Curated annotation (Swiss-Prot):
The lineage of its organism: Bacteria, Pseudomonadati, Pseudomonadota, Gammaproteobacteria, Pseudomonadales. GO terms for molecular function: acylphosphatase activity. It comes from Pseudomonas paraeruginosa (strain DSM 24068 / PA7). Its EC number is 3.6.1.7. Gene3D superfamilies: 3.30.70.100. It catalyses: an acyl phosphate + H2O = a carboxylate + phosphate + H(+). It is an enzyme of class 3 (hydrolase). It holds the Pfam family Acylphosphatase. Residues 5-91 form the Acylphosphatase-like domain. This is Acylphosphatase. Signal peptide: none annotated.
């Protein structure tokens, strides 16, 4: 299966609810590489890459988010592979 890279902006009640840490945990569980960070406008930005099936699984997870989050929308775009190793929470 091919490796792909996706980039997303997640809106709604997604800050102050453990969204970044939960995203990192889910990405690591799926064996993905990338990063997640809060934006000043209240959204969360995520970039991740890996095997297509796992990348799409994280995309579906982002549409729900962790239990305390209320996701209002996810804007996703495909990008070229970034060559990232590991998954981190950016500040």
């Amino acid at each position: 299966m091919a490796r792909i890279c996706l980039h997303a902006y997640v809106g709604g009640r997604v800050q102050g609810v453990g969204f970044r840490q939960s995203t990192r945990d889910e990405a690591e569980r799926l064996g993905l590489d990338g990063w997640v960070r809060n934006l000043e406008d209240g959204r969360v930005e995520v970039l991740w890459e890996g095997e297509e099936e796992q990348v799409k699984a994280l995309q579906r997870w982002l549409e729900r988010g962790p239990r305390r989050a209320r996701v209002a929308g996810v804007e996703v775009e495909a990008l070229p592979l970034q060559g990232i190793a590991g998954f981190i929470v950016r500040r």
